[in-house]
Amino acid sequence: MMAWQIRCCLAKRRKETDMDWIEIRDMLGLEITPDQLRKQAVGYEEYDNYIHGFNTVATSILSISDLHVPFQLDYTVLEKYKNVDILQINGDVVDCQALSKFPKQYRISPMSEMIEGRQYLIDLIKYINPKRVICNYGNHDIRFANYFAKNLDTDILQLQPNTSLELIFEDGFKNYDKVNRTKTHYAPLVDVFEDSGIDIQFVDDWKVKIGKTWFVHPLAYRSGILATADKAKGFLQDTDKDSFDCVVMAHTHSVGDSEKGYIRLIEQGAFCDVNKMRYSDGRLQKPQKMGFAIVCQDKDGNLIKDKTKVVILD
C-alpha cells in the first residue's frame, strides 16, 4: 500500500474524516473487503504511533479546582502525581466567604484567605514540583471585583485588580494590621519561584487552553450530569477557531467522564472538604464530590484517552 493510502486509513482511525470504510476502500481502488481494510488500518496505526510518538505521553497535566481556601484538602493526597509537567489550577482558589451572598453565621476575612491561600499554593507547588504552573480564575475568585464594583466609585476601581489571584500570583500584596500597627508584604508567586526553574503563569480569564484541552470555570451551571461541561463544549465550538478534543470542567463540584462526538467531557470534582462547606444545607441539592483530573497529551497536544482520567476522592 502506498504512503498516501496509509494516510487515508490513519485519518479514518483518528476520526479526521467522516468517510466510511467502504468509501475509503473504493477511493483507494483496493480489492479487499471494508472489514479487511479496517483491520489492516489498526496495524498501520500501531506502527505509526510507535514511529512518531503518538500515544506516548509528552505532557502530563494535574488539574485541581475549587480549593475554596480555607476549606482546601491536604495536598499530600496528590503524592502519586509529583513531578508532572504541568500543575493546572482551574479556579476558585480562595472562597471569598465574607463576600458571598449566602447567609452566614461567621465571617472569614478576605485578607486571611489570601494569606492562607498564598501559603498553601507555595507548599503545594513545592510538593508537586511541576515544570509549569498555570492558573485561571473561577466564580468565587471574581467575587473580589464584584464586591468592589458594588461598593466603590469607578475611579477607585481602577486601582483594584479583578481577583485576588492577580495579587497572589503577579503583584504581591500588603496586610496593614491596624491593631498592631504593622505592615507585612507578601511577595507574588512569580517572585517566590523565580529561581526554582518552575514557570508560574496566571491567566486572567475563566478558561485556558493547553494543547487541545480546554480547562474552564464558568459562571454558568446546569444540574444534569456533565450538562455544564456539554454547554461549555457548545460555547467553545462556536468561539474556538482551532480544534480541541477535551473540556475539563471545574465549578460544578461533580465528577463525570464521557464523550460527546469526538470531544471528551470531564467534570473534575472539588479539591476541598465539601463537608465543611455549608452553602447547600437544606437545599436538597445533589451531593458534592471531591476529586481532580489527570490529563495526558502526545507531542502535538492531542488527548491520550486511555491515560486521561478523573480521580475521585470520596
What would you call each of these model-derived segments?
Residues K299-D314:
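A short C-terminal boundary segment appended to hydrolase-like catalytic domains
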Residues E45-V57:
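Short Lys/Arg-enriched helix C-cap and helix-to-coil transition segments
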Residues N151-K231, A270:
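Active-site-proximal loop/helix segment associated with metal-binding centers of metalloenzymes
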Residues I64, V69-T182, Y186, V190:
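Core catalytic region of metal-dependent phosphoesterases/phosphodiesterases
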Residues M2-M19:
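Short, amphipathic alpha-helical "recognition" segments used to contact nucleic acids or chromatin
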Residues S63-S65, I86-D92, I134-N139, F215-P218, ...:
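Active-site neighborhood of phospho(di)ester-bond hydrolases with catalytic His/Asp-centered motifs
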Residues M2-Q5, I22-G43:
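Short, basic interhelical loop/turn and adjoining N-cap
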Residues L219-L303:
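Conserved beta-sheet core of the metallophosphoesterase superfamily
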